[in-house]
Amino acid sequence: MKSCIYPGSFDPFTLGHLDVIERSANIFDKVIVSVGENASKKYTFSLEDRLNSIKNNVKHIPKVSVVSFSGLLADFAYESGCKVVIKGVRNFQDFDYERLLHDIGLTQQRGIETLTIFSKSELSHVSSTAAKEICKNGGLLENYVPLSVKQELETTLNGQLILGVTGEIGMGKSYFSEKFCYVESIYGFDIKHIDLDKLAHDILHNRTERVYIDLRHSILKEFGLSIGNESIIDKKKLGQIVFNDRPSLKKLNDMMRIPIMTRIRKEIGNFKGCILLNGALLVEAGFLPICNNNIVVVKSSKEKQFYNLTQRGYSVEQIENRINSQLNTDTKIKLIEESINKYGHGKLFEFTNYVGEEEFDQIDKIKRWIDCYLY
């Protein structure tokens, strides 16, 4: 049986590491991912956390085992019966460094050879150090680490856990969010509610930065001058256009994606605690990874949904157009479940509004889940 060792500190485990493991498994019958432990080195994650993180993200590869080691790699490889050590190489600096380590290994006379696997071009910038720095500054991590690791970084380095709140329009997402924040505050927990509708309103009405003025100009150019000017976009007039035409709604979502994500990062800032990200279009806009696939889908009766929307001043026709322009509850749930399966990480909660004391039981279930990660 051909076997190899892939050593590293994996602090944290990245998509680059995962790629090297998957490619090694195509060559060897057995891949031993070996997590090094050096008493003189300071790690972000404990040895146990690193082992569990890797095991969770390689469980789809049957040829892989995950173990820890200390001391000389050459000795560990020798006692493991492996003649080949795999090293991932991203650039010339990596190559020179790994060549030096290989030469040092040869002096230990264990007959161990080094096989270098060059990173894919789209992963050549990925490193554990870069992932940690990006996390500390609130940047996008989806292309650096698996979602489970992204969540581990956010909770460990930033003290943050992001929970998405979504559902059809008029189902009571804000009602749930406000009630949840109230319950959490009673227990003395820190929680922040970010309403994506309010962020969008701020971008379309108030932001004076040049990039947002240019965005409003682009929206006017796309949807017509009748919806406002470069200073203010009339959301109702814009809504009459996009909620009657799904391609137009998708176009608007695409235009707003980066501005919204930028404002989300600004809103989150250095806040420590649970962050509720409330938006009807979390699924449609591709925001599930921001929440690490941790989502509360808010549900209610159709009668209550219509009542809530009529209270906002919408006509029956406007209500039907808005409902029909968005994914229904069952479809949202299906797509969230598919995303959880795809990324191997996430948690789906279903919350039914306006059911009296049962609401507190549902909230308590979500609260206990949050406590496992933050408190």
For the regions a protein language model found, what residue spans apply to each?
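NTP-dependent small-molecule kinase module
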Residues: T156-L163, I169, Y175-K179, K266-C274, ...
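ATP-dependent small-molecule kinase phosphotransfer cores
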Residues: K198-K272
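Nucleotidyltransferase catalytic core that binds NTPs
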Residues: M1-Q160, S300
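Short gly/ser/thr-rich secondary-structure transition/capping motifs
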Residues: T14, V66-S68, I275-A280, S325
